Amino acid sequence: MIPGELFIQDGEIELNAGRKTVTLTVANTGDRPIQVGSHYHFFETNPALKFERKKARGMRLDIAAGTAVRFEPGQTRDVQLVALAGKKTIYGFRGDVMGKL
């Protein structure tokens, strides 16, 4: 093996298979771009992002780990969210939950 070498299987890799998902329309009503990372609790994103926030509780973006979605000022786009896994406890972010979902 060479350092940094990757061994990739043939075929497609399905992310988050079998998890609950929801698609929301999100609008950036602010005057600055807002970027949201793959594992950020979407319910707690910047208040300038307008969407059906209650539907995002316990959800994150359904994108590859380590990537992000950027919302430009005035932009509206649809995003797919996926349910968080694990113990379903949320700490940090904006401090809106701080415990079990």
UniProtKB/Swiss-Prot annotation:
- Sorted alphabetically, which Pfam families does this protein's record hold? Urease_beta
Q: Which UniProt keywords apply?
A: Cytoplasm, Hydrolase
GO CC annotation terms, alphabetical: urease complex
Name a GO molecular-function annotation. Answer: urease activity
Q: Per the UniProt record, which EC number(s) apply here?
A: 3.5.1.5
Major place of residence: cytoplasm
- Keyword check for Cytoplasm, yes or no: yes
| InterPro entries per the UniProt record, alphabetical | Urease_beta-like (IPR002019), Urease_betasu_sf (IPR036461), Urease_subunit (IPR050069)
Catalytic activities:
urea + 2 H2O + H(+) = hydrogencarbonate + 2 NH4(+)
Phosphoprotein is among the record's keywords: no
In which pathway is this protein known to take part? Answer: Nitrogen metabolism; urea degradation; CO(2) and NH(3) from urea (urease route): step 1/1
> What biological processes does GO assign it?
urea catabolic process
Compartments it resides in: Cytoplasm
Subunit annotation: Heterotrimer of UreA (gamma), UreB (beta) and UreC (alpha) subunits. Three heterotrimers associate to form the active enzyme.
PANTHER family to which the protein is assigned, alphabetical: UREASE
Protein family: Belongs to the urease beta subunit family.
Q: What is this protein called?
A: Urease subunit beta
Tell me the organism: Bradyrhizobium diazoefficiens (strain JCM 10833 / BCRC 13528 / IAM 13628 / NBRC 14792 / USDA 110)
- Write the gene name: ureB
